[in-house]
Curated annotation (Swiss-Prot):
Gene that specifies this protein: rpl19e
Domain of life: Archaea
Function according to Swiss-Prot or TrEMBL: Binds to the 23S rRNA.
Source organism: Pyrococcus abyssi (strain GE5 / Orsay)
Record bears the keyword rRNA-binding: yes
InterPro entries: 60S_ribosomal_eL19_sf, Ribosomal_eL19, Ribosomal_eL19_CS, Ribosomal_eL19_dom, Ribosomal_eL19_dom1
Keyword Ribonucleoprotein attached: yes
Example GO BP: translation
Pfam families: Ribosomal_L19e, Ribosomal_L19e_C
Annotated Gene Ontology cellular component terms: cytosolic large ribosomal subunit
Protein name in UniProt: Large ribosomal subunit protein eL19
One of the record's GO molecular function terms: structural constituent of ribosome
Transmembrane spans: none
Length: 151
């Protein structure tokens, strides 16, 4: 087997790819070995003796399957998580999610006449200040301070 290092390098330059992607016809190795100029290499490329192999891609098969599983909620447990809690959902996003839920609940209570306007305003401001982490905490506060009107 002849070494075709120089021919491979020149062909790689001409075909604008890496040396590993150069295919040389095993039947015509002697012709390639005798080619010493760039012009000779160009001629062999034209004849199809030297070709450029296609790029090897990265198969998405397993990734697609994993993605489908994740859509179903698999592979999302504590053992699969990397990074902080805030890396998965930002602090601001979490705040928006919480405050929207609280404000919606307060609006509902006001419309149902379970709390009056003054109580609503007081609770709204406290929610804005971050006193309640959840709707449950809001209801606990309402019960402790007897702020819910009985119908």
């Amino acid at each position: 087997m002849k070494t075709l290092k120089m021919q491979r390098r020149v062909a790689a330059e001409l075909l604008k790819c890496g040396e590993n992607r150069i295919w040389i016809d095993p039947e015509r190795v002697d012709d390639v070995a005798s080619a010493i100029t760039r012009e000779d290499i160009r001629r062999l490329i034209k004849e199809g003796v030297i070709k450029k192999k296609p790029v090897k891609g990265q198969s998405r098969y397993r990734a697609r399957i994993r993605h489908e599983q994740k859509k179903k909620g698999r592979h999302r447990g504590p053992g699969s998580r990397k990074g902080k809690k805030t890396a998965r959902m930002g602090k601001k996003e979490l705040w928006i999610k919480t405050i929207r839920a609280l404000r919606k609940e307060l609006r509902k209570l006001k419309e149902q006449k379970k709390i009056d306007r003054r109580t609503y305003r007081m609770l709204y401001i406290r929610a804005k200040g971050g006193q309640f982490k959840s709707k449950h905490q809001l209801y606990m506060f309402l019960e402790e301070h007897n702020l819910l009107k009985k119908r």
